[in-house]
Amino acid sequence: MHRSAHTDSFARDNLPPQNMWPDIDLSKFDYGPGLNAAVELTDTMVARGFGDNVALIGNGRRRTYKELTDWTNRLAHALVDDLKIEPGNRVLIR
């Protein structure tokens, strides 16, 4: 199993035995052993030219990938710079 940056190991410690895990073939995808879903769902979409496309619809609003990327980057900087959250800490955002 790939090493995790999470400092809280509760979820990993309570997984079922590895022989009970499903077999998932990811060989068709160009991802390394670790995946940052936030980057793939925001920054990568902007980099591929989809920045002006709608990413989210809800509460009567539409957000583009560029807007979503800007918001997540501001949120990440606030968590790290203002609240001193470190990589590996778990955060619940409501």
Locations of the language-model features?
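Short, contiguous pre-domain boundary segments
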Residues: 18-27
